Amino acid sequence: MHPMIPAEYISNIIYEGPGADSLFFASGQLRELAYSVETTAESLEDELDELDENWKGSSSDLLADAVERYLQWLSKHSSQLKHAAWVINGLANAYNDTRRKVVPPEEIAANREERRRLIASNVAGVNTPAIADLDAQYDQYRARNVAVMNAYVSWTRSALSDLPRWREPPQIYRGG
């Protein structure tokens, strides 16, 4: 973030934004989907074991091969879903942490309002030191917000690059 971005701009974006609830929800949905994929894989494995006991021959071998490849994909897919849920949950927590660290908009507004009030009543420069103090405080707000947002951007970029690369399910039938 540019160091001259007004402090209230960053605070307002963070405080007035949609929040992290949708990310927490998505993370939970991905965990549920991962569980569903695991359950499906276990069910298929049980069916394959039962079929293997009762059905022998080349067609049974072809089916077993196809199902085994699909089961491997399901297992990897379930792990990827869990990992994606973990990353997204981390993103939501990072957002909430950033929100806690950013200067609240009300605090910045109070600073600016007090500055305006002091300027309006600055007869013979009596309020000049107090105005300077408020300006210094505002500069600290800006620096803090920029630093917090830079850390957030850095962390989220790293986390997003850690999301899994999804693969298509294997082809069930290998023509030959």
Swiss-Prot record:
Q: Which gene encodes it?
A: PPE57
* Subunit structure of this chain's protein: Interacts with human TLR2.
Subcellular locations according to the entry: Secreted, Cell wall; Cell surface
What is the role of the protein in this entry? Plays a key role in regulating innate and adaptive immune responses through human Toll-like receptor 2 (TLR2). Interacts with TLR2, leading to the subsequent activation of the mitogen-activated protein kinase (MAPK) and nuclear factor kappa B (NF-kappa-B) signaling pathways. Induces macrophage activation by augmenting the expression of several cell surface molecules (CD40, CD80, CD86 and MHC class II) and pro-inflammatory cytokines (TNF-alpha, IL-6 and IL-12p40) within macrophages. Also participates in adaptive immunity by directing Th1-polarised immune responses.
> What species is given as this protein's source?
Mycobacterium tuberculosis (strain ATCC 25618 / H37Rv)
- Does the entry feature the keyword DNA repair, yes or no? no
Q: Name one GO cellular component term.
A: cell surface
Give the record's keywords alphabetically: Cell wall, Secreted, Virulence
User: What does the sequence similarity comment in the record state about its family?
Assistant: Belongs to the mycobacterial PPE family.
Protein name from the UniProt record: PPE family protein PPE57
Q: Which InterPro entries match?
A: PPE_dom, PPE_sf
* Organism phylogeny: Bacteria, Bacillati, Actinomycetota, Actinomycetes, Mycobacteriales
Asked whether the UniProt record includes Secreted among its keywords, one would answer: yes
Q: Which Pfam families match?
A: PPE
Biotechnological relevance: how is it used?
Immunodominant antigen that could be used for serological diagnosis to distinguish patients with active tuberculosis from M.bovis BCG-vaccinated individuals. Candidate for development of a vaccine for the control of tuberculosis.
Give the main localization category. Answer: secreted
Alphabetized SUPFAM superfamilies for the sequence? PE/PPE dimer-like
Recount the UniProt induction comment for this entry. Answer: Expressed during infection. Expressed during exponential growth in vitro.
